[in-house]
Amino acid sequence: MSGMSYHDATSPIHRGVFLIRFILGRTLRPPNEAFSPLSPDLHPDLTTRERVTLQSSPDNCQVCHSKINGLGFALENFDAVGRFRSQERAKTLDSTGKYVDRDGNEVSFSGPRELAEYIISSDDAHRAFVNRAFQHFVKHPPAAFGLHTLDELTNAFRKNNFNINELIVEIAIIAATRDPSLSE
């Protein structure tokens, strides 16, 4: 948690970006313009969530922040160093969030436990895990071995009850038997 925070404050944006890119396997464009986060000193009565919502509310920001913020807000129960908390600035924390998956389904969650339960069952997360595992072991993206390789591996991973050993075997078979130069 502390790696995705400032030294004295949480960063739902950094936490949300990490989750969306590395856990859920989605891509984000860089911001259209540079900005500096609002200092907590400028709005001492606002929680981090309220400050982030204020700063990222313009429509041009919402293109990405509508995806990012909800994921990060679900982790607001953890302070800058990862300690659990239920209040910030004498206010009860709001750790509810939303996420729209690749298929356009909106998922709502309240807090880190519900977020974790969603991720465990998420097709986006399963696909991202398979993709990262393939790239780790083979040093190439799955698409280099065929347009449907990632789908095949993700379906096999699911069929094998998310058995990582079986996934590694499937990856090894594909890497050993398919020529990336002949991919579809």
What are these regions (language model features)?
Residues M1-F137, L147-E184:
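Active-site substrate-binding loop specific to GH73 endo-beta-N-acetylglucosaminidase modules
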Residues V138-P142:
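Axial heme c-ligation environment in periplasmic c-type cytochrome domains
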